Design a protein with these regions (language model features):
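Extracellular cell-wall/glycan-interacting regions and their flexible linkers
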Residues: 1, 198-252
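Acidic, aromatic-lined catalytic clefts of primarily extracellular/periplasmic carbohydrate-active enzymes
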Residues: 1-136, 166-213
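Catalytic and substrate-binding regions of cell-wall glycan-acting enzymes that process beta-1,4-linked
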Residues: 135-179
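Residue-level recognition of short, well-ordered coil/turn positions
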Residues: 147, 163-164, 195, 231-232, ...
């Protein structure tokens, strides 16, 4: 996994679920892989994205009928169809080659908009290139999972200021009045747990001391992969929530 491994592991959910078309609920559309929602995509866009990810044309063609279907219509589509699946390698490719560029650009745009409207509370001249790997991973995950940083003003401001004590107060995500227990727990362990974060910083320093510099983003992703390899995803993942749901809100 090249980038944003925390988000990837969270989005694939229960083992095998993401490899078949499924309906996450709410206002989402038919979804496959790590959050590829076809509810607001055109047939041509779906076909191009899926084949670019290495999915065979026959499977991609079978999925283009899910275009523009959301809510109950998407749920019915999933219930009426079977025998469509992709491989683990294909869903990784879909994430890395299609979804990461798409949501990274959304994150960059939303940060610029947020900074413009909160100039008095964020660092001067802050932009995507000035952020640490930790900041990028967090903000990318919130855009990918919830759709909007604007729904989390206290958290976004705290992340941009690297005020981790305040982030620890506001990081929890809720949906329909229920906390996303597993995602919140893993988020804290990876990005906020003082002991774990300190361990990562020490490992980075050791690598530099041995003249083996590792890019911060790459090191962070490697450590997240190791964290998930020690965990049982199938028994602990939260139910996937539609990205554009109005039910997302910040813990205050």
């Amino acid at each position: 996994m090249a980038k944003y491994t925390f988000t990837y592991h969270q989005e694939i959910g229960h083992q095998g679920q993401s490899l078949v078309p499924h309906f996450p609920g709410g206002r989402s559309g038919v979804t496959i892989g790590p959050g590829y929602d076809m509810g607001h995509r055109t047939p041509q866009e779906i076909y191009t994205d899926l084949t670019n990810a290495g999915i065979d044309p026959e499977t991609a063609y079978a999925l283009i009928d899910a275009a523009d279907k959301t809510g109950p219509e998407a749920a019915s589509w999933v219930a009426e169809r079977g025998g469509i699946f992709i491989t683990e390698q294909q869903q990784r490719s879909l994430f890395e080659n299609v979804l990461v560029p798409e949501y990274e650009q959304r994150t960059i745009d939303q940060i610029a908009s947020f900074v413009s409207s909160h100039a008095d509370s964020v660092p001067e001249n802050v932009d995507w290139d000035s952020l640490s790997g930790r900041q990028k991973q967090i903000l990318f995950d919130y855009v990918y999972n919830t759709g909007s940083l604007a729904r989390f003003p206290e958290l976004t401001t705290a992340v941009l200021n690297e005020d981790w004590d305040t982030v620890s107060i506001h990081y929890e995500r809720f949906s329909d009045d229920q906390p996303l227990v597993y995602r919140n727990e893993m988020f804290y362990r990876e990005f906020l747990d003082p002991e774990y974060v300190h361990k990562k910083e020490e490992e980075a320093e050791i690598g530099n001391a041995n003249n083996q510099p590792v890019a911060e983003d790459q090191l962070l992703d490697q450590q997240i992969d190791e964290l998930y390899s020690e965990d049982e995803l199938a028994e602990n993942t939260d139910d996937v929530q539609a990205k554009d749901s109005d039910e997302w809100y910040e813990h205050i």
